[in-house]
Amino acid sequence: MKKSLIALAVLAASGAAMAQSSVTLFGIVDTNVAYVNKDAAGDSRYGLGTSGASTSRLGLRGTEDLGGGLKAGFWLEGEIFGDDGNASGFNFKRRSTVSLSGNFGEVRLGRDLVPTSQKLTSYDLFSATGIGPFMGFRNWAAGQGADDNGIRANNLISYYTPNFGGFNAGFGYAFDEKQTIGTADSVGRYIGGYVAYDNGPLSASLGLAQQKTAVGGLATDRDEITLGASYNFGVAKLSGLLQQTKFKRDIGGDIKTNSYMLGASAPVGGVGEVKLQYALYDQKAIDSKAHQITLGYVHNLSKRTALYGNLAFLKNKDASTLGLQAKGVYAGGVQAGESQTGVQVGIRHAF
């Protein structure tokens, strides 16, 4: 009898420990047929692509209840390509963080979305992916160089506050950790944050960030200010973004760009959603401007599976060479002043 009681106590203790911890395997497989009418050489491109409605991914995440409202967690997530498998070189560059959360909010350490991108890309109706999302967080203008930290950053420390009656904020700092002799100083460094108000149908956010990128081997400041807002009327949702980016260069002068986005989405029959979004990208110093219109529809077959279609049109003016992003098929620009049209039809499954 005594041995039985001891055995039951051990089982109960182990069950409680298991209940306090969890590990989840998750992912999305998103594959589509895509067509782009024109590349930089004037030729059309078509084929099987990936990440049209959501970025295809595979990951592990877990939490441990430490008691007193404190939780530890980890998140490892990498991109996958449903069109060709792309098994070689898999990594966790979408996110690789360890965290602590509680009544004070959440602290994360590791590679992650920078706070400004994490919050403000939520106003993009196409979730910063597919053939025609808002491209303001990328270095789209001539002379801006490589986009190091506009969306994600290595060596990032970030903090997200709890919600205070609708008000919330997030802040982050990424170390540059220069390790290679001869590289530009401070490249990779990020400092920025946002303040937001989310209450019922209304959401509004203001983000400020400075990143160190590299142009011609020289470190360059990328100063970014972004304002985003949305309002859900029930029958439709309106969303908008205003962004100004300034590159401070030692050689060649500063580059100033403005990006604007306005979109609307509406539910269809309880199982679908139609989306229409317009964006303008303007670099006045060299008379470079591009207009972008994207139309999309998502039809949910279940909570985890959906069919979708995207149609995008991009019109460059003057010196602009922007291009649509049909991942797995074509992701490049066109000749200056040329227009481009693209289509994606695909399926997305989450697990």
From Swiss-Prot:
Localization per Swiss-Prot or TrEMBL: Cell outer membrane
Entry protein name: Outer membrane porin protein 32
Lineage of the species this protein comes from: Bacteria, Pseudomonadati, Pseudomonadota, Betaproteobacteria, Burkholderiales
Keyword annotations: Cell outer membrane, Ion transport, Membrane, Porin, Pyrrolidone carboxylic acid, Signal, Transmembrane, Transmembrane beta strand, Transport
Keyword Hydrolase set for record: no
Modification sites for Pyrrolidone carboxylic acid: 20
Organism: Delftia acidovorans (Pseudomonas acidovorans)
Domain of life: Bacteria
Known role: Forms anion selective channels.
GO process annotations (BP): monoatomic ion transport
